[in-house]
Amino acid sequence: MEGMTQRLEAMLAKGTDNMLLRFSLGKAYAEQDCFREAETHLRAALAFDPAYSVAWKWLGKACLGQGDKAGARAAWESGLQAAQARGDQQVVKELQVFIKRLDKEAAAGG
């Protein structure tokens, strides 16, 4: 996976900058538990397309990975709105589950 992030970072350094590149970098960094880097690239991806619900999903994971539950909730709620607007039912279901987990943790005092 690190080889992929290096290749993607090289593309970015050469001047390529678009939603798919930033999303791919953000997702790859999140999968490596490099959440701060993931957040940076996912926010950049969303600047290109704020309706891209999957980027919101991964941004929430990156925020949660940094201990930012409020940021995760905000990202997932934005993603939920985007997914509902696009009719992306799978992402809607996933985000509803993530939000419910946060609610359960909050109710349990976590």
What is the predicted function of each stretch?
Residues 11, 44-45, 79:
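Canonical positions in the second alpha-helix
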Residues 14, 48, 65, 82-86:
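Structural marker of alpha-solenoid helical repeat scaffolds
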